[in-house]
Amino acid sequence: MGKMIVFLFIIVFGFILKTMYDAGEFKTLEPHYSGDCSSVTGVVGAEDITFLNNGTALISSDNRRSRINGSEAQGTIYQYKPRAKNHKLINLMPKLDTGFHPHGISVYEEPDGKTYLAAVNHHSSGLFNSRYGHSIELFIYDSDSLVHVRSVSGPLMISPNDIVLINKDQFYVTNDHGSSSRIGQTFEEYLQ
C-alpha cells in the first residue's frame, strides 16, 4: 500500500512539474526590444491589433471580466492612430444588439482603397447569433466607422482564435482547440 501511494505521488508531482514547465514557469525572459514602447489607455481586454497601410491601428477589445460578472457589455473595435499627436481612441462599432465579443481580427485593403475587416466573434446571443456559438463578422471600414456586411459560421469553427483575410470573400481561421466541450478543451490544455 505504501509503495502505491509513493508511486501515485510521483506521478502527480511529475504531472504538476510538466505542466509548470509547459507553461513557461522555469523560463527567464530577457528584454530585447531597443525601441520606445507606450501604452494605449482606455482599451479594456485588448485581444488583437492590426495595422492598415497608412499606419492606423485597429484593436479588438472585449471586457470578458464584466461578462463573467453578468454584464451585457458588447465588445468593440477601436481605431488608434499612433503617429497622430494626442489621438483619442475611436470606437468604430455600429450600434448593435449585444452579441459581439471579438477575438482575432484581420484587414484586407483593395487597390482602390476599399478596406475590409474580419473579426472572430465569440457570441452567445444577439444580432450575430448562430447555432455554432462562434462566427466571423465581416465589415467594411470607412475612415472612422465600420459597416457590418455579413456573418459567416459553420461546424468547422470549433474554437476560432485568429483570422487572416485573403480577399474580401476568403479567409483562413485557426481553432485553438479541437474539442467544443469545456472539459475536452481542459484536457487538451493539460494533457498535450
Q: Predicted segment positions?
A:
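Positively charged n-region of N-terminal signal peptides that target proteins for export
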Residues: M1-M4
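Blade/loop signatures of beta-propeller domains
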Residues: F9-G35, G75-Y80
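A short helix->beta-strand "capping" segment at the edge of beta-propeller domains
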Residues: D22-V44, K85-N91, S145-L146
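Short extracytoplasmic
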Residues: C37-N63
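Blade-loop segments of beta-propeller domains
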Residues: V40, G45-A46, R64-S66, G70-P111, ...
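Residue position within the beta-strands of beta-propeller blades
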Residues: L58-S60, A119-V120, V173-T174
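Beta-propeller blade signature
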Residues: A73-A84, R131-S143, Y190-Q192
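Asp-box/WD-like beta-propeller blade repeats and closely related beta-sheet repeat scaffolds
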Residues: M93-E109, K114-Q170, G178-S181, Q185-T186
